[in-house]
């Protein structure tokens, strides 16, 4: 069964890019769109995050994977309703500090529009865009709704649109049913 084909609800704005980025590692099906430099370059270019389809370096690939792991850990804390682990926060902060974005103002329809632009191309630029998206999500209050599936075999990121903000599964039809059925069978075996 391929439960991760249904990623659930899309996150708002650039947080959706962050969700898709973390989900480049499909733990359930054993696929990784950041498996190597070529695959990572293709994924980032396809998402419009990599300037000029510029290939990334081995160090850049490691940094992208570290960012992905930190964001997945932070989203798991959202799922559990726990404080974010310091190690993940520090890893995120370190990567964001090394790969910064700058504020750019443009005239738009007689007014001014602001945007964040990465200072560099390649993996560093992609990290800057992703870090800026997380920053924006924290400011707008949408960050706490980005969660990691509670199925340890999946951990797919999803956007929790429930009123109570207590969703735990990327898909109730998939992971929710799988985990609940597993728990039921375990209880039956134990006789409780």
List the model feature ranges, each with a label.
Residues 129-185, 189-192:
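BZIP DNA-binding basic region
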Residues 1-148, 155:
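Short helix-coil boundary/hinge micro-motifs
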């Amino acid at each position: 069964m391929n439960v991760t084909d249904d990623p659930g609800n899309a996150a708002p704005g650039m947080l959706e890019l962050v969700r898709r980025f973390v989900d480049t590692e499909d733990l359930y099906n054993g696929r990784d769109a950041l498996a190597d430099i070529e695959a990572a370059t293709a994924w980032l270019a396809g998402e419009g995050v990599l300037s000029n389809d510029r290939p990334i370096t081995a160090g850049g690939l490691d940094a992208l994977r570290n960012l992905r792991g930190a964001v997945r850990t932070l989203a798991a804390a959202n799922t559990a309703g726990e404080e974010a682990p310091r190690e993940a926060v520090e890893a995120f902060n370190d990567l964001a500090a090394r790969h910064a974005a700058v504020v750019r103002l443009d005239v738009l329809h007689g007014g001014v529009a602001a945007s964040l632009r990465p200072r560099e191309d390649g993996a560093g630029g992609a990290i800057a865009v992703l870090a800026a998206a997380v920053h924006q999500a924290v400011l707008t209050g949408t960050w706490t709704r980005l969660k990691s599936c509670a199925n340890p075999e999946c951990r797919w990121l999803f956007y929790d649109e429930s009123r109570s903000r207590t969703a735990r599964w990327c898909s109730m039809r998939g992971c929710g049913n799988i985990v609940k059925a597993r728990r039921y069978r375990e209880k039956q075996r134990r006789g409780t």
